[in-house]
Amino acid sequence: MGNKTSRKSKEKSGRNYTTELRSYEAACKEDMEIQSFDTRMQARTSHVISTLATGVEVRSLSFDSLKAVIGSLLDMNQEVAKVILDCKKDIWKNQEMFEFVEAYFETSLKTLDFFNALKRGLQGVQINHLFILDGNGYKKTLQELKRFKDADRPFDQDFFKMFQSVYNQQKWMLDKLQRRQNKLDKKLKRIRTWRKLSSIIFMATFATLVICSVLAATMAAPHVAAALAAATPPVGSMGKWIDSLWKNYENEIKGQTEVFSSMYVGTYVAVQDLNNIKDLIKRLDTEIRGMVKNAEYAGELGPVKIGINAIKTQLEVFKKNVEELEIQADMCSTDIRRARTVILQRIINATCST
């Protein structure tokens, strides 16, 4: 009985956004600005999904994967912020639009929480890395290598909870948009500004939801990410492609139990680059136990010296990747805050002048 209920629920969710997707396709045909947005969005989303599909066989995320996801969220936020500012005069005059923009910014706060969790994990990695490079003498370095190897995973349960929160907030945003559109009268639906604004925010939110779903599947159900990456974008607007991707995603995910909740219950993000370093350390640890009985004599052992130097060299490369990812996360967080500040300030100015 439970399976039947679950199946009906999933079949229903697949039809939830059909009307909105068709409306988006129609708007895309009539508005050059939406067409331009659509082209950029389709290329960006396709690139992110393909990047996430890399390495799914080991259920891990590389730095390139995380950077691609962050970059896509950054770009989409910039696109939406630009449209909101371009339409500001019409937005301030219409309560429905105004509330919709507020909801969009509410969603962006959840995204900031996710980036804060990501930054905390990256900072933990950097601290352990610095201890190793600053180790004076082999005895101290060996101790720090062991501490690094035994350290807690940088992306813990908090990271997954924040990610789940971002996903849930994007879903909430889509549902809110759907309810708003159902309440609007026909005259408002024909207003060009509202159509452009709602179409672009809807598609940006839906694309983010799909990307988050594929990111989750990369860890919990690797074959889903691979299947979606192999899907060829159809000719036409992104609405058709996103609709197709979403249906494929739901079909692939059927029969699996609570994919997204399993992400942070007994599962963790295995950053591939970090695991490679830890594997090297483990191998070196085995060699050291066999060759070194007294840490004070480590300086005389050539193989140990070479092994430690090799790890330090790889750690330098790893450090650069961590720093680049942290910079990108900072950029996205700063951009979201800046867009919120600018738009909220203009809301205040518009209110004062009326």
Swiss-Prot record:
Subcellular location: Membrane
InterPro entries (UniProt xref): DUF677 (IPR007749)
Any coiled-coil regions, as ranges: 270-341
Entry membrane topology: Multi-pass membrane protein
Domain of life: Eukaryota
One GO CC term, this protein: membrane
Annotated Pfam families: DUF677
Family, per entry: Belongs to the UPF0496 family.
Stated name of the protein: UPF0496 protein At4g34330
UniProt organism field: Arabidopsis thaliana (Mouse-ear cress)
Organism lineage: Eukaryota, Viridiplantae, Streptophyta, Embryophyta, Tracheophyta
